[in-house]
Amino acid sequence: MFRRNTLTPGKGRNSLDMFSVNDFMTWIDGMKKTSDENGCSPFTLKPIKSTSDRKRRRHSRMSIVNVWNQSPTSYRDQLLHFNHESDVSIDDTSEVAGEETFGQIERFEYLLSSDGDGDGDVEIENPEVDDYQVSEHDFGLEDDFNGDGCQQMIEIESDEAISEEEEDLSNENKSESQLGESFSFNQDNTFVNYASPASITEEFVEPKDSQFNHDVNLMQGSAPGYSTVEPEDNFASEIQTNAPEVHLNYENSDYTEDHIDLLDHHFCDLSEISKFNHQHSGKPDHPSLVSNASLAPFIVEGNGIKNGLLHYNMETAETDESYTDLDDTFARLKNLSQRHTNHSTDHHDDTVDSHLLHSFVSAENANEPTNDVDDNSLQEQVADASQFVSFLETTKTVATSNLRSTKRKLSEILENGQSGDCSLTDTNVDFDISEKQASGNSRSMIPLRKKR
């Protein structure tokens, strides 16, 4: 009920959680202490004597940033793996960093056996490579400060040294290109050294070792200076085995009309198309891998793939036509809304015309003088007019007055119920709804709380 030794209830019925006496005295003591330290008191309002009497603030902690005795950019260069201002280029650093990753392809040397046996053995020299450790000198990460803590001087190379380095680089590139020209693979994936003498130059059988094949494939893909020629047969077989193949270019192919009709009949079944292509076409001109989703724009009701292709432009499908489709959509929505508004206004006008027609017929009947001579002709006119109005309503030339979308008031329902144009079921339904509304409004509200 009470907190500590409070004189006011802490957790009572409707009271606030107020300060206790101890809290109040602690607050006053704190005010006294801070005011004494600042040189003035809230009770005596003494002026501050001098600025030296103020409480000292804590020292700045910005010195923590400068703990390391190094260049501020050296740590950033360690993160980026190379120094922008050094002479080491990005290509050299990528080669140094990726040498271990690529399985040290540069360190493999494929040499032909010099025995002259012609047995086709391939020797692989793979000297044991020590664990490659990256030094700061390779990345150009040398610190700007030497051991004594003094900043080092940066040597600027002369033009002669730079030109000598460029000549060395050009010589290395020439030697690499000559090495690449001397070695190549022919179409059967057999290794040939065209730089060797004619007695040694032979076509060697592909070795059975899978590890060697893996290394050869690696070297074909990523080692510089080696040229490879991919055979077309393997490429076509990979396409036929890996994915379904659909030949959509009918004009340049050898298909007959029956074949095209068969394709149009089975355009959804990709397995049928691929099976048909394998049987009837030796090699496709341009093999394209098509999925069911990409065939969707070609599948038109009543048209086959051939007709769908003629009316579909693949190049502008995802760029220009998307915007035109968007504009067409907005234009279609605008026309649709305009048509709806026109239809609603026409419906309203037709309803008014129907009312006028009914009232005109009834008024004309009431105003006519009743003579025995003209009685038969009048009845015929009334029958003809009512038949004409009903004919217009049944043929929907004029909208009927009792087909309204909005709910009608009770007085309007009773008026229309007395006239003959409103159906009995419509009156009953609307009458029940109006009864419920009237009874709901007349009921008294339940009070939210009891009166005391």
Swiss-Prot record:
It comes from the Eukaryota. Its main location: cytoplasm. The keyword Cytoplasm applies. It is found in: Cytoplasm; Nucleus. Keywords: Cytoplasm, Nucleus. One of its GO terms (cellular component) is cytosol. This is Uncharacterized protein C1805.14.
